[in-house]
Amino acid sequence: MLYDRFGRPVTNLRISLTQECNYRCFFCHREGQRFLAKNELTPEEIERLVRIASRLGIRKVKLTGGEPTVREDILEIVKRIKPYVIDLSMTTNGSRLKELAKPLAKAGLDRVNVSLHSLKPEVYKRITGVDGLEAVLEGIEEAVKYLSPVKLNMTVMKGLNDGEIWDMVEFAAKTGTILQLIELEAPREMAETAFFRKYFYPLKPVEEKLEKLAVETKERRMHRRKKYFIPTDYGIAEVEVVRAMHNTVFCANCTRLRVTSDGKFKTCLLRNNDLIDFLSAMRNGASDEEIVEIFKRAVLMREPYWK
């Protein structure tokens, strides 16, 4: 297993498969990738990377984007990398889950996170730029059958969907999904912009209310986040709160190494001066051991953003 200079183990790989997306969410951080990548990793290159990572103790992989399901070879990618990992998941907008949930599960995907920022069609369209709520809800229904546990990612934004938090808690209970309430996040230089101030909605008061309502709480090892079990008319809802801004505990317990869609290691979502190219080495005939050394160099560059 690899450890960074701060004693944090690296156990998770978060791979952006593409920067292409069929949605236009106005707040999207694009996994920290600022520019559209035209040189995407091939399925063979992704498989090789994950195989090497598994030798280093990295056995959990999350596929992201952009929107990973817009890649026509998504099933091949999943099938290729599953033998090397114990937990293979994906973050998706859910637009193609109705047709893909079962094939993805058959290919080896274990579970999904679905971005669901509103249950109101007009608000959903305003946030995502797409009139696609109904298709996503149908996709979630299919995902629950084949890719459980399904997590719903709701980025809470002031004046847009902050009034839907408790409706979403009930929806999670009703559908048997797990709700993640997520604060808007941004690098330091963006946190004082008019955009951020307009939409940032602090979740601390919400978490305090969840604490009071919960019939049970647990703590996740990842980021030391609490899980709240909330009684509703539809049964118990499982709710997590992601508050990354200025959260030193969140960063101190990060175990992720990110991979950009154009073949670079990225040590932190909020940094852009930390990219380490491995794809050029791969395509120029580098051995597995040489890729391992690039892995190690990337891990040693990791440091908590908030500390």
Swiss-Prot record:
Binds 2 [4Fe-4S] clusters. Binds 1 [4Fe-4S] cluster coordinated with 3 cysteines and an exchangeable S-adenosyl-L-methionine and 1 [4Fe-4S] cluster coordinated with 3 cysteines and the GTP-derived substrate. PROSITE patterns: RADICAL_SAM. Residues 5-231 form the Radical SAM core domain. [4Fe-4S] cluster 2 binds at residues 251, 254, 268. Its cofactor is [4Fe-4S] cluster. It catalyses: GTP + AH2 + S-adenosyl-L-methionine = (8S)-3',8-cyclo-7,8-dihydroguanosine 5'-triphosphate + 5'-deoxyadenosine + L-methionine + A + H(+). One of its GO terms (biological process) is Mo-molybdopterin cofactor biosynthetic process. The keyword Hydrolase does not apply. PANTHER family: MOLYBDENUM COFACTOR BIOSYNTHESIS PROTEIN 1, MOLYBDOPTERIN COFACTOR SYNTHESIS PROTEIN A. This is Probable GTP 3',8-cyclase.
